[in-house]
Amino acid sequence: MPRSGKKTASTATATAQVEWRNRILRHELTDPKTLIPHPDNWRLHPVPQKAALEGAMVEIGWIQEVVVNQMTGHILDGHLRIELALEHGDSTVPVTYVDLTEDEERLVLLTFDP
């Protein structure tokens, strides 16, 4: 909003935005062996990052769910956490299942924080 406190055309439009859709279907514990790494995942994790995450997982545990597309079974966020869970023999991992098209999946891969 401008300093004068008056709404301009651009701020008035911003207030009339459409409500965001909730694409989350459910949260559940899932066998990590059933989850599929996304074939278009471009993020590579260096050894120090993997070691740091492993140390945090050992000391703290799970604090964030992995995100998986219900339609394809592809992991959208949490590839490294799943890799570590498989290496450590975890039988379940916390997962948020979402409902996205394959095009939306690719957009999520490009925009989620690494």
Which ranges hold each PLM region?
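Short, charged/polar connector segments at secondary-structure boundaries
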Residues: 2-100, 104-114
